């Protein structure tokens, strides 16, 4: 099933496909992560817009069963600081990678998309990237089957005593 859509997205990565073409993975706000086919990518008018860590407003064809296609990009905003600072790039790559594995392809998840974008915005604004990353990890860890328990003792399950947090046992 193919549909023409207008959506925001973030370029997660791209890779060469055949001689001239590219496959570009974009986390879209409205349709989840999608793989887009870009023919003659080097000569494409979209080439500069399809770099990693670039926010897009795109018009395209979303295909539920295979590759999707871009017909136009009305806005492309690269993260300048993230792309120029090796540490910011490393943290941003880690957040993008976590988001990629936290969500199956083609699954809609606007909250995760928004949270990733906000986290990248904060890194771009030079907010402490270690803190931003730690908060991001805490928020998405439940998607991997892990969670912290602050509500009770993880051994005796009492709630009426002062507690101390244990990293070893992921709880109080």
Where do the model's predicted regions map?
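Non-catalytic alpha-helical scaffolds and adjoining flexible linkers that form interface surfaces
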Residues: 1-172
